[in-house]
Amino acid sequence: MIIGVGTDIVQIPRIEKIIKLYPEIFPKRILNTEELKKFALLKKESHVTFLAKRFAAKEAISKAFGVGIGRGINFKDITLLNDELGKPIVKIDSLYTQKLPPFNIHLSLSDDYPICVAFVVVEKIIL
């Protein structure tokens, strides 16, 4: 059973401008500790796309839960990792989601400059 669907589109040049203005503050605002470690290992030319994808994904995830960022789920509550094949894996540590029945999150990310898009389906696990 589908709990919710969310999508978000990010203009990558918008993220570039924000990073130029706030090169240290912006990543710390949207990435949690685990993601910041991964971010630090990236080549500088990969920073913008990495941040744009995470921004779009986290917005789409919060929309799929019907709350939006800052109203039950925050940027740092969501961790985006990848499996060995590169498939996105989502972990959420939020009081809001702890009240929900067990669920899976299906995330698709795509970027083609100047656009990045995230699409999310949250599915209730039927036991």
Swiss-Prot record:
It comes from the Bacteria. Its main location: cytoplasm. InterPro entries: 4-PPantetheinyl_Trfase_dom (IPR008278), 4-PPantetheinyl_Trfase_dom_sf (IPR037143), ACPS (IPR002582), Ppantetheine-prot_Trfase_dom (IPR004568). GO terms for cellular component: cytoplasm. It holds the Pfam family ACPS. It is found in: Cytoplasm. It comes from Rickettsia bellii (strain OSU 85-389). Belongs to the P-Pant transferase superfamily. AcpS family. This is Holo-[acyl-carrier-protein] synthase. It catalyses: apo-[ACP] + CoA = holo-[ACP] + adenosine 3',5'-bisphosphate + H(+). Transfers the 4'-phosphopantetheine moiety from coenzyme A to a Ser of acyl-carrier-protein. Mg(2+) binds at D8, E59.
